[in-house]
Design a protein with these regions (language model features):
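Short solvent-exposed loop/turn micro-motifs enriched in small/polar/acidic residues
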Residues: 13, 204-206, 275-278, 312, ...
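Dual-mode signal for accessory low-complexity, basic/Gly-rich regions
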Residues: 293-362
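Extended hydrophobic packing segments that form well-structured cores
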Residues: 367-413
Length: 413
Protein backbone atom coordinates (compact mmCIF):
# COMPACT_ATOMS: atom_id res chain seq x y z
CA UNK A 1 0.00 0.00 0.00
CA UNK A 2 1.39 3.37 -1.04
CA UNK A 3 1.79 6.25 1.39
CA UNK A 4 0.09 9.59 0.74
CA UNK A 5 3.40 10.96 -0.54
CA UNK A 6 3.73 8.06 -2.98
CA UNK A 7 0.15 8.51 -4.22
CA UNK A 8 0.79 12.19 -4.86
CA UNK A 9 3.93 11.31 -6.78
CA UNK A 10 2.00 8.74 -8.82
CA UNK A 11 -0.71 11.33 -9.55
CA UNK A 12 1.87 13.84 -10.80
CA UNK A 13 3.45 11.14 -12.98
CA UNK A 14 0.04 10.28 -14.41
CA UNK A 15 -0.65 13.87 -15.41
CA UNK A 16 2.77 14.51 -16.95
CA UNK A 17 3.36 11.13 -18.61
CA UNK A 18 -0.18 10.18 -19.68
CA UNK A 19 -2.31 13.31 -19.39
CA UNK A 20 0.13 15.53 -21.27
CA UNK A 21 2.74 13.10 -22.57
CA UNK A 22 5.32 15.87 -22.13
CA UNK A 23 8.09 15.63 -24.72
CA UNK A 24 11.78 16.38 -24.40
CA UNK A 25 12.37 20.06 -25.15
CA UNK A 26 8.70 21.02 -24.75
CA UNK A 27 7.58 23.93 -22.55
CA UNK A 28 4.95 23.23 -19.86
CA UNK A 29 2.58 25.92 -18.59
CA UNK A 30 0.93 25.07 -15.25
CA UNK A 31 -2.10 27.07 -14.11
CA UNK A 32 -2.68 26.51 -10.40
CA UNK A 33 -4.31 28.07 -7.35
CA UNK A 34 -1.76 29.23 -4.81
CA UNK A 35 -3.27 26.73 -2.34
CA UNK A 36 -2.11 23.90 -4.62
CA UNK A 37 1.51 25.05 -4.97
CA UNK A 38 2.93 21.89 -3.38
CA UNK A 39 1.28 19.71 -6.03
CA UNK A 40 2.22 22.07 -8.86
CA UNK A 41 5.85 21.67 -7.77
CA UNK A 42 5.52 17.87 -7.92
CA UNK A 43 4.18 18.15 -11.47
CA UNK A 44 6.97 20.55 -12.43
CA UNK A 45 9.58 18.14 -11.08
CA UNK A 46 8.06 15.27 -13.09
CA UNK A 47 8.07 17.44 -16.21
CA UNK A 48 11.74 18.31 -15.83
CA UNK A 49 12.46 14.62 -15.27
CA UNK A 50 10.77 13.98 -18.63
CA UNK A 51 13.06 16.48 -20.36
CA UNK A 52 10.79 19.53 -20.29
CA UNK A 53 12.48 22.68 -21.62
CA UNK A 54 10.90 25.01 -19.04
CA UNK A 55 7.98 25.02 -16.59
CA UNK A 56 6.10 28.33 -16.56
CA UNK A 57 3.69 29.02 -13.69
CA UNK A 58 0.37 30.87 -13.87
CA UNK A 59 -0.96 31.39 -10.33
CA UNK A 60 -4.51 32.24 -9.22
CA UNK A 61 -6.26 32.90 -5.92
CA UNK A 62 -9.97 32.57 -5.11
CA UNK A 63 -9.99 35.34 -2.52
CA UNK A 64 -8.25 37.85 -4.78
CA UNK A 65 -10.54 36.91 -7.67
CA UNK A 66 -13.60 37.63 -5.55
CA UNK A 67 -12.13 40.94 -4.34
CA UNK A 68 -11.59 42.01 -7.93
CA UNK A 69 -15.19 41.33 -8.95
CA UNK A 70 -16.50 43.19 -5.89
CA UNK A 71 -14.20 46.20 -5.80
CA UNK A 72 -12.28 46.81 -9.06
CA UNK A 73 -13.22 49.75 -11.29
CA UNK A 74 -15.95 48.83 -13.73
CA UNK A 75 -14.02 49.23 -16.99
CA UNK A 76 -11.51 46.59 -15.85
CA UNK A 77 -13.97 43.87 -16.88
CA UNK A 78 -14.06 44.91 -20.53
CA UNK A 79 -10.36 44.55 -21.28
CA UNK A 80 -7.59 41.97 -21.10
CA UNK A 81 -4.00 43.22 -20.73
CA UNK A 82 -1.78 42.70 -23.75
CA UNK A 83 0.73 40.69 -21.69
CA UNK A 84 -1.98 38.18 -20.79
CA UNK A 85 -2.94 37.71 -24.44
CA UNK A 86 0.69 37.06 -25.33
CA UNK A 87 1.15 34.71 -22.37
CA UNK A 88 -1.57 32.34 -23.58
CA UNK A 89 -1.44 32.80 -27.34
CA UNK A 90 2.34 32.76 -27.74
CA UNK A 91 2.93 29.60 -25.73
CA UNK A 92 0.05 27.90 -27.56
CA UNK A 93 1.52 28.80 -30.95
CA UNK A 94 4.83 27.37 -29.72
CA UNK A 95 3.08 24.05 -29.02
CA UNK A 96 3.61 24.16 -25.26
CA UNK A 97 1.75 21.71 -23.03
CA UNK A 98 -0.85 23.17 -20.65
CA UNK A 99 -1.77 21.69 -17.27
CA UNK A 100 -4.66 23.26 -15.35
CA UNK A 101 -5.04 22.31 -11.70
CA UNK A 102 -8.71 22.98 -11.04
CA UNK A 103 -9.52 23.60 -7.37
CA UNK A 104 -11.84 26.31 -6.11
CA UNK A 105 -14.67 27.06 -3.72
CA UNK A 106 -17.85 26.19 -5.70
CA UNK A 107 -19.55 29.28 -4.26
CA UNK A 108 -16.62 31.68 -4.30
CA UNK A 109 -18.48 34.20 -6.48
CA UNK A 110 -21.87 33.89 -4.79
CA UNK A 111 -23.47 37.33 -4.64
CA UNK A 112 -21.13 38.83 -7.25
CA UNK A 113 -22.66 40.90 -10.07
CA UNK A 114 -23.21 38.38 -12.89
CA UNK A 115 -22.90 41.21 -15.41
CA UNK A 116 -19.26 41.71 -14.43
CA UNK A 117 -18.57 37.98 -14.74
CA UNK A 118 -20.13 37.84 -18.21
CA UNK A 119 -18.27 40.93 -19.42
CA UNK A 120 -14.95 39.54 -18.17
CA UNK A 121 -15.70 36.27 -19.96
CA UNK A 122 -16.55 38.11 -23.17
CA UNK A 123 -13.35 40.17 -23.00
CA UNK A 124 -11.30 37.03 -22.38
CA UNK A 125 -12.99 35.27 -25.29
CA UNK A 126 -12.10 38.10 -27.64
CA UNK A 127 -8.52 38.35 -26.44
CA UNK A 128 -7.78 34.62 -26.37
CA UNK A 129 -9.63 33.52 -29.49
CA UNK A 130 -6.42 32.19 -31.08
CA UNK A 131 -5.64 30.19 -27.96
CA UNK A 132 -9.18 28.78 -27.78
CA UNK A 133 -9.14 27.84 -31.45
CA UNK A 134 -5.81 26.02 -31.11
CA UNK A 135 -7.06 24.24 -28.00
CA UNK A 136 -10.21 22.99 -29.72
CA UNK A 137 -8.39 21.85 -32.85
CA UNK A 138 -5.41 20.01 -31.40
CA UNK A 139 -2.83 22.75 -31.62
CA UNK A 140 -1.23 21.74 -28.32
CA UNK A 141 -1.67 19.13 -25.56
CA UNK A 142 -3.66 20.15 -22.51
CA UNK A 143 -4.97 18.46 -19.39
CA UNK A 144 -7.27 19.48 -16.55
CA UNK A 145 -7.04 17.75 -13.17
CA UNK A 146 -7.99 18.57 -9.58
CA UNK A 147 -6.82 18.25 -6.00
CA UNK A 148 -8.77 19.18 -2.84
CA UNK A 149 -8.74 22.51 -1.06
CA UNK A 150 -10.53 23.07 2.28
CA UNK A 151 -13.40 25.24 1.01
CA UNK A 152 -14.25 22.73 -1.71
CA UNK A 153 -13.91 19.73 0.62
CA UNK A 154 -16.29 21.30 3.15
CA UNK A 155 -18.87 21.90 0.41
CA UNK A 156 -18.70 18.23 -0.61
CA UNK A 157 -18.65 16.91 2.98
CA UNK A 158 -20.34 19.64 5.06
CA UNK A 159 -20.91 17.43 8.12
CA UNK A 160 -17.24 16.54 8.58
CA UNK A 161 -14.46 18.57 10.24
CA UNK A 162 -12.17 20.20 7.71
CA UNK A 163 -9.32 17.72 8.08
CA UNK A 164 -11.64 14.73 7.65
CA UNK A 165 -13.39 16.38 4.70
CA UNK A 166 -10.02 16.88 3.02
CA UNK A 167 -9.08 13.25 3.65
CA UNK A 168 -12.39 12.01 2.20
CA UNK A 169 -12.07 14.18 -0.90
CA UNK A 170 -8.50 13.00 -1.49
CA UNK A 171 -9.74 9.39 -1.27
CA UNK A 172 -12.57 10.11 -3.72
CA UNK A 173 -10.25 11.80 -6.22
CA UNK A 174 -7.68 9.00 -6.06
CA UNK A 175 -10.44 6.45 -6.77
CA UNK A 176 -11.72 8.55 -9.66
CA UNK A 177 -8.28 8.75 -11.28
CA UNK A 178 -7.54 5.06 -10.67
CA UNK A 179 -4.84 5.48 -8.03
CA UNK A 180 -5.45 2.55 -5.71
CA UNK A 181 -2.11 2.25 -3.97
CA UNK A 182 -0.65 -0.55 -6.08
CA UNK A 183 1.43 1.73 -8.32
CA UNK A 184 -0.35 0.56 -11.48
CA UNK A 185 -2.44 3.60 -12.39
CA UNK A 186 -0.53 4.38 -15.61
CA UNK A 187 -1.12 0.84 -16.89
CA UNK A 188 -4.77 1.01 -15.84
CA UNK A 189 -5.21 4.25 -17.74
CA UNK A 190 -3.81 2.75 -20.93
CA UNK A 191 -6.33 -0.12 -20.59
CA UNK A 192 -9.17 2.32 -19.87
CA UNK A 193 -8.40 4.38 -22.97
CA UNK A 194 -8.45 1.21 -25.09
CA UNK A 195 -11.93 0.39 -23.74
CA UNK A 196 -13.22 3.86 -24.63
CA UNK A 197 -11.66 3.58 -28.09
CA UNK A 198 -13.59 0.37 -28.80
CA UNK A 199 -16.85 2.11 -27.88
CA UNK A 200 -15.99 5.04 -30.15
CA UNK A 201 -15.35 2.65 -33.02
CA UNK A 202 -18.79 1.06 -32.58
CA UNK A 203 -20.62 4.40 -32.47
CA UNK A 204 -18.78 5.64 -35.54
CA UNK A 205 -19.77 2.47 -37.40
CA UNK A 206 -23.44 3.07 -36.55
CA UNK A 207 -23.24 6.67 -37.87
CA UNK A 208 -26.49 7.84 -36.28
CA UNK A 209 -28.58 10.59 -37.82
CA UNK A 210 -30.05 11.56 -34.45
CA UNK A 211 -30.33 10.64 -30.78
CA UNK A 212 -33.46 10.89 -28.63
CA UNK A 213 -33.10 11.30 -24.84
CA UNK A 214 -35.98 10.48 -22.45
CA UNK A 215 -36.29 10.01 -18.69
CA UNK A 216 -38.72 10.46 -15.80
CA UNK A 217 -37.46 13.95 -14.94
CA UNK A 218 -39.23 15.12 -18.08
CA UNK A 219 -36.36 15.13 -20.55
CA UNK A 220 -37.54 14.50 -24.11
CA UNK A 221 -34.84 15.83 -26.38
CA UNK A 222 -33.96 14.97 -29.96
CA UNK A 223 -30.40 15.74 -31.04
CA UNK A 224 -29.57 15.66 -34.74
CA UNK A 225 -25.94 14.93 -35.56
CA UNK A 226 -24.12 16.65 -38.44
CA UNK A 227 -23.18 14.82 -41.61
CA UNK A 228 -19.69 13.38 -41.24
CA UNK A 229 -19.68 13.59 -37.44
CA UNK A 230 -17.28 11.41 -35.47
CA UNK A 231 -17.33 10.22 -31.88
CA UNK A 232 -14.24 10.76 -29.78
CA UNK A 233 -13.06 9.76 -26.31
CA UNK A 234 -10.45 10.60 -23.71
CA UNK A 235 -7.36 10.12 -25.84
CA UNK A 236 -6.66 13.04 -28.18
CA UNK A 237 -3.87 13.65 -30.68
CA UNK A 238 -2.41 17.05 -31.56
CA UNK A 239 -1.84 18.11 -35.15
CA UNK A 240 1.83 17.31 -34.51
CA UNK A 241 0.96 13.74 -33.48
CA UNK A 242 1.37 14.05 -29.70
CA UNK A 243 -1.19 12.01 -27.73
CA UNK A 244 -2.76 13.49 -24.58
CA UNK A 245 -5.82 13.18 -22.33
CA UNK A 246 -7.62 16.49 -21.85
CA UNK A 247 -9.53 15.51 -18.71
CA UNK A 248 -8.35 13.29 -15.89
CA UNK A 249 -10.61 11.63 -14.92
CA UNK A 250 -12.59 10.86 -18.07
CA UNK A 251 -15.31 8.28 -18.66
CA UNK A 252 -17.01 9.85 -21.67
CA UNK A 253 -17.38 9.34 -25.38
CA UNK A 254 -18.61 12.48 -27.11
CA UNK A 255 -19.49 14.22 -30.34
CA UNK A 256 -20.92 17.55 -31.47
CA UNK A 257 -24.57 18.10 -32.42
CA UNK A 258 -25.93 19.90 -35.45
CA UNK A 259 -26.33 23.48 -34.24
CA UNK A 260 -29.91 23.88 -35.48
CA UNK A 261 -30.93 20.24 -34.97
CA UNK A 262 -31.74 20.09 -31.25
CA UNK A 263 -35.40 20.16 -30.17
CA UNK A 264 -37.42 19.44 -27.04
CA UNK A 265 -36.87 19.84 -23.31
CA UNK A 266 -33.92 18.73 -21.19
CA UNK A 267 -33.72 18.60 -17.39
CA UNK A 268 -30.57 18.72 -15.28
CA UNK A 269 -29.78 15.61 -13.26
CA UNK A 270 -27.19 17.18 -10.94
CA UNK A 271 -26.38 20.70 -9.69
CA UNK A 272 -23.98 22.76 -11.78
CA UNK A 273 -21.20 24.82 -10.22
CA UNK A 274 -20.51 27.62 -12.71
CA UNK A 275 -18.56 30.83 -12.24
CA UNK A 276 -18.63 30.47 -8.46
CA UNK A 277 -22.40 29.92 -8.25
CA UNK A 278 -24.43 26.74 -7.68
CA UNK A 279 -27.24 26.25 -10.22
CA UNK A 280 -29.73 23.49 -9.42
CA UNK A 281 -32.95 21.85 -10.62
CA UNK A 282 -33.01 23.56 -13.99
CA UNK A 283 -34.29 22.81 -17.45
CA UNK A 284 -34.11 24.22 -20.97
CA UNK A 285 -36.72 24.32 -23.70
CA UNK A 286 -34.99 24.09 -27.07
CA UNK A 287 -36.29 24.88 -30.56
CA UNK A 288 -34.25 24.50 -33.74
CA UNK A 289 -31.12 24.25 -31.63
CA UNK A 290 -31.66 27.45 -29.63
CA UNK A 291 -32.43 27.58 -25.91
CA UNK A 292 -35.71 29.54 -25.84
CA UNK A 293 -36.68 29.04 -22.19
CA UNK A 294 -34.58 28.78 -19.02
CA UNK A 295 -35.91 27.75 -15.61
CA UNK A 296 -33.99 26.97 -12.41
CA UNK A 297 -35.02 26.57 -8.79
CA UNK A 298 -31.59 27.82 -7.70
CA UNK A 299 -29.25 30.14 -9.60
CA UNK A 300 -31.62 31.06 -12.44
CA UNK A 301 -30.05 34.51 -12.89
CA UNK A 302 -26.59 32.97 -13.22
CA UNK A 303 -27.86 30.39 -15.71
CA UNK A 304 -29.58 33.01 -17.84
CA UNK A 305 -26.35 35.01 -17.85
CA UNK A 306 -24.39 31.92 -18.89
CA UNK A 307 -26.55 31.22 -21.96
CA UNK A 308 -26.41 34.85 -23.15
CA UNK A 309 -22.64 35.41 -23.05
CA UNK A 310 -22.83 35.51 -26.85
CA UNK A 311 -25.14 34.26 -29.59
CA UNK A 312 -23.61 30.79 -29.62
CA UNK A 313 -24.04 30.32 -25.87
CA UNK A 314 -27.74 29.59 -26.40
CA UNK A 315 -26.95 26.67 -28.74
CA UNK A 316 -25.29 23.34 -28.00
CA UNK A 317 -21.74 22.18 -28.69
CA UNK A 318 -21.38 18.69 -27.22
CA UNK A 319 -23.26 15.53 -26.33
CA UNK A 320 -21.37 13.04 -24.16
CA UNK A 321 -22.28 9.52 -23.12
CA UNK A 322 -21.27 8.29 -19.66
CA UNK A 323 -22.76 5.18 -18.03
CA UNK A 324 -24.67 5.75 -14.81
CA UNK A 325 -22.67 2.89 -13.31
CA UNK A 326 -19.33 4.65 -13.72
CA UNK A 327 -16.48 4.58 -11.17
CA UNK A 328 -17.28 8.17 -10.24
CA UNK A 329 -21.07 7.84 -10.13
CA UNK A 330 -20.84 4.73 -7.98
CA UNK A 331 -19.08 6.72 -5.26
CA UNK A 332 -22.42 8.51 -4.72
CA UNK A 333 -20.66 11.82 -4.16
CA UNK A 334 -21.72 15.17 -5.61
CA UNK A 335 -18.38 16.86 -6.26
CA UNK A 336 -19.64 20.35 -7.18
CA UNK A 337 -16.89 20.27 -9.79
CA UNK A 338 -17.76 19.70 -13.44
CA UNK A 339 -14.57 17.73 -14.11
CA UNK A 340 -15.87 14.98 -11.83
CA UNK A 341 -19.63 15.40 -12.02
CA UNK A 342 -19.65 15.31 -15.84
CA UNK A 343 -17.93 11.93 -15.65
CA UNK A 344 -20.62 10.59 -13.34
CA UNK A 345 -23.44 11.05 -15.85
CA UNK A 346 -24.30 11.72 -19.47
CA UNK A 347 -23.93 15.41 -20.15
CA UNK A 348 -24.59 18.04 -22.77
CA UNK A 349 -22.75 21.33 -23.22
CA UNK A 350 -24.06 24.64 -24.42
CA UNK A 351 -21.61 26.84 -26.29
CA UNK A 352 -18.57 26.06 -28.44
CA UNK A 353 -18.55 22.79 -30.39
CA UNK A 354 -15.55 20.53 -30.60
CA UNK A 355 -14.49 19.89 -34.23
CA UNK A 356 -15.92 16.35 -34.14
CA UNK A 357 -16.08 15.94 -37.90
CA UNK A 358 -14.04 13.89 -40.31
CA UNK A 359 -11.09 16.20 -41.02
CA UNK A 360 -12.45 18.71 -38.50
CA UNK A 361 -9.11 19.52 -36.90
CA UNK A 362 -7.87 20.99 -40.17
CA UNK A 363 -11.01 23.05 -40.85
CA UNK A 364 -11.24 26.79 -40.28
CA UNK A 365 -13.88 28.21 -37.96
CA UNK A 366 -15.94 29.29 -40.97
CA UNK A 367 -15.73 25.80 -42.46
CA UNK A 368 -16.87 24.24 -39.19
CA UNK A 369 -19.80 26.65 -38.99
CA UNK A 370 -20.73 25.86 -42.59
CA UNK A 371 -20.85 22.17 -41.62
CA UNK A 372 -23.33 22.94 -38.85
CA UNK A 373 -21.16 23.27 -35.72
CA UNK A 374 -21.73 25.94 -33.10
CA UNK A 375 -19.30 28.78 -32.39
CA UNK A 376 -19.06 30.51 -29.01
CA UNK A 377 -16.57 31.85 -26.49
CA UNK A 378 -18.08 29.59 -23.81
CA UNK A 379 -18.49 25.84 -23.30
CA UNK A 380 -20.47 24.70 -20.25
CA UNK A 381 -21.23 21.05 -19.47
CA UNK A 382 -24.34 20.13 -17.48
CA UNK A 383 -25.40 16.68 -16.38
CA UNK A 384 -28.51 14.96 -17.77
CA UNK A 385 -27.85 11.28 -17.03
CA UNK A 386 -30.14 9.42 -14.62
CA UNK A 387 -30.69 5.80 -13.63
CA UNK A 388 -33.67 5.65 -16.02
CA UNK A 389 -32.21 7.60 -18.95
CA UNK A 390 -32.93 5.99 -22.30
CA UNK A 391 -31.23 7.10 -25.52
CA UNK A 392 -32.36 5.80 -28.88
CA UNK A 393 -30.28 6.33 -32.00
CA UNK A 394 -31.88 6.63 -35.43
CA UNK A 395 -29.75 5.64 -38.41
CA UNK A 396 -29.84 7.27 -41.82
CA UNK A 397 -31.95 4.38 -43.13
CA UNK A 398 -34.54 4.82 -40.36
CA UNK A 399 -33.54 2.02 -37.99
CA UNK A 400 -33.95 2.74 -34.26
CA UNK A 401 -31.19 1.27 -32.10
CA UNK A 402 -30.99 1.46 -28.28
CA UNK A 403 -27.84 3.30 -27.20
CA UNK A 404 -28.66 3.67 -23.50
CA UNK A 405 -31.15 1.60 -21.50
CA UNK A 406 -31.87 2.54 -17.89
CA UNK A 407 -28.85 4.77 -17.56
CA UNK A 408 -26.21 2.50 -19.08
CA UNK A 409 -24.94 1.54 -22.52
CA UNK A 410 -27.19 -0.93 -24.30
CA UNK A 411 -25.83 -4.38 -25.02
CA UNK A 412 -23.51 -4.32 -28.01
CA UNK A 413 -22.61 -0.62 -27.76
Amino acid sequence: MESMEEKLQEYAQLLVQVGLNVQKGQTLVISSPVECAFFARLCAAEAYEAGCREVVMNWSDDALGRMKYLHAEDDVFDTVPLWRRHFYNDYALEGAAYLAISASDPENLKGVDHGRIVRAQQASGRALKDFDRLQMCGGFPWCIASIPIPSWAKKVFPDLPEDQAMERLWEAIFRAVRISGDGRCVDQWHQHIETLARRVEKLNQLNFKSLRYTNSLGTDLTVELPEGHIWEAGNDVTLAGQTYIANIPTEEVFTSPLKTGVNGVVYSALPLSHNGTIIDKFHFVVKDGKIVEVRAEQGEEALKAAVTVDEGASYFGEVALVPYDSPISNQKILFYNTLFDENAACHIAFGEAYPCLQGGQEMSKDELKARGLNDSITHVDFMVGTADLNITGTTHDGREIPVFVNGNFAEGI
